Structures are given as C-alpha cells and as structure tokens.
Amino acid sequence: IPATPGMEIRGVTEMFPLNGPSWSLFYEYIGNILYALFIRRLPTKVLAALVLLAGCGLAAFAVWGPYGDICAGFSLTGDNIAGGSLRLLFSFSAGLLMSRVFRPVKVKGAVWVCSLGVVVLLAVPRIGGEENYWMNGLYDTLCFALAFPLLVYLGASGKTTDRTTARICKFMGDISYPLY
C-alpha cells in the first residue's frame, strides 16, 4: 500500500519507503489496467498519436518542470504523480507501438553496441545546474525520445551468435530481476 508523504518517516516522501523501486511496479499495475481496458484496442495511428502526446508532455515536464529531469513518480505528490504518469504513458505506449510496427534489421554485435550506448548515455553527468534545469531536461528528452527507443530497436533486432555473448546475456538476464 503506498504511503502518503506525511506517513513516510525519512522525509524523502517515498511512496514505498521499505522498498523504493516498488513505485515503478505501482505504475506498471496502472499501465496493465489501462492496457486491458483501453490501450490494446487503439488503432496503430491513434496509438502513435498517444505516444506523441505523452512524449510531448514528458518533454515539457523534463524541460520546464520542477526537477529538470524525468526522475519522478516515486512519491504521492502532485509533481511526482504527473511525472510518473507521463513516464508510464510514454514508455508503455511507445513499447506497444514498437511491437506493432517492428521490422528487424541486421545488426552485428547488437548486444555490445547497445551496452556501450547505455553506458555512454548514463555516464553523462547532470547538465546545467540549478539555474539551467532546462538543459538537463533537454538531455533527458533526447534520451527517452530518441536514444533509448533506438537502443531497444537495435537490441530487439540483434541475435547472439557466439557462446560467450550468449552466456553473458543469460547471466545478465538471470540477475536482472533479483537486483531489481
């Protein structure tokens, strides 16, 4: 059960103070309910419009919002509910859209290309500072709107052909959920 900001004793207003990452599962439940009731029935063009609208909303939240990023959703405050909902609507709908229109391309070493891409993107420190939140928001927008979907597309197109890569991928897959 989510904790309201007044009930959370550490003062960081986490929705799930005993298990911080559970906030994302909270939004996944909402996404699954929306999918079951509405989103799965949307025609592909309407789904694309939803992705575009949610992406624009999330970009506006990142660039002009209170944090200068999309790190929101972990608390039951207005800003966090708005940010978390936009994150859910964009990523969930974009994933569904990608699954509908996906046509694989040949990518040699996709797992290594995608891994390097993720490391490079996540290694960039916060940009701009308190006076220029918009700069980091713009970087976050470029990541979620262009870079991350491209990495997912390339990764989904790739095939592991050698034993070493297959073993590494299996190991990473096996530990990903327990670490989460």
Predicted regions and their residues:
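Small-polar-interrupted transmembrane alpha-helices in polytopic inner-membrane proteins
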Residues: V46-P66, C114-L122
